[in-house]
């Protein structure tokens, strides 16, 4: 199969959080989503439905120490169509899966002269189990159960400070980080249903990856409601290569308290985002849209968020 040609995503999230006390916030989010990916030139596709439940929290251990965490579970169902040569040779299948995921982040702030120095650490992990399934078709393939383990850790430091100007404030920042992506033992094992003696296997991500990240940026905030931001980040994957990312953003809050924002972000392909946000009768409405520029395969999306405090 060749690379993905088209992807359509649709999701609805419903959540709520509560401030338990001055130092703790807890929340829950339920998300139902669909991800439809067309693959290759013959019409192969993977249509996945997922339902996820996440619990999250944010804790202030004291005035300068913070702990954020999230844990969640997902149920997955995929309708798979594999085509080898146009519409004349089609295999179909249905695969179920389960996933558990979590993230833990710790940070501590230190003040030095006019700067804030924040050491931080993070750990992200997930375990996914995909059930075995057998295709239906003339060249059907049987796929064994598959377990996918993902684990990534990082340690870093953020340095930031404010510069006060007439009618405005400039906040600059520098970010340094070391991360490690641990290799997964996940293996895909298959065989053709017409040949029960020969099996095929494939294993990706066989080695650990060390990742170095450095970035800097600033925010310019004017009292008239204008905010301009810029960030540059370079990520070096040892023995593999590097990724450069640039983010430019601008927003303005009008006299009617409507916020308009535009972003430009990307590496080789830049994505443009346009957002509008407004509070109406205690409800925060946000409309988000994005479009990828200079890409052979255009990507575009839209999002509507509604939130309120009770």
What is each residue range found by the language model?
Residues 1-310:
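Membrane translocator/pore-forming domains, dominated by Gram-negative outer-membrane beta-barrels
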């Amino acid at each position: 199969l060749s690379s993905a040609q088209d992807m359509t995503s649709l999701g609805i999230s419903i959540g709520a959080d509560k401030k338990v006390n001055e130092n703790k916030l807890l929340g829950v989010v339920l998300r139902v989503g669909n991800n439809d990916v067309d693959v290759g030139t013959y019409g192969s596709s993977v249509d996945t439905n997922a339902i996820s439940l996440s619990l999250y929290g944010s804790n202030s251990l004291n005035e300068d120490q913070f702990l954020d965490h999230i844990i969640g579970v997902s149920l997955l169902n995929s309708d798979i169509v594999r085509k080898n040569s146009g519409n004349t040779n089609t295999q179909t299948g249905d695969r179920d899966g389960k996933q558990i995921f979590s993230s833990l982040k710790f940070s501590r702030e230190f003040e030095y002269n006019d700067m804030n120095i924040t050491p931080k650490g993070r750990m992200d992990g997930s375990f996914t189990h995909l059930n075995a399934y057998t295709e239906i078709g003339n060249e059907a393939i049987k796929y064994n159960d598959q377990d996918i383990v993902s684990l990534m850790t990082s340690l870093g430091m953020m340095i930031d400070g404010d510069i006060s100007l007439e009618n405005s404030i400039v906040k600059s920042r520098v970010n340094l980080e070391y991360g490690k992506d641990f290799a997964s033992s996940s293996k895909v094992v298959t065989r053709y249903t017409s040949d029960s003696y020969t099996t095929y296997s494939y294993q990706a991500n066989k080695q650990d990856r060390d990742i170095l990240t450095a970035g800097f940026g600033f925010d310019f905030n004017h009292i008239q409601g204008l905010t301009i931001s810029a960030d540059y980040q370079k990520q070096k994957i040892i023995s593999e290569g590097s990724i450069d990312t640039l983010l430019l953003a601008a927003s303005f809050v009008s006299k009617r308290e409507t916020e308009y924002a535009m972003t430009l972000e990307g590496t080789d392909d830049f994505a443009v985002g346009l957002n509008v946000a407004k509070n109406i009768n205690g409800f925060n409405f946000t409309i988000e849209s994005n479009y990828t520029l200079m890409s052979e395969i255009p990507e575009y999306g839209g999002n509507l968020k509604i939130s309120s405090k009770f």
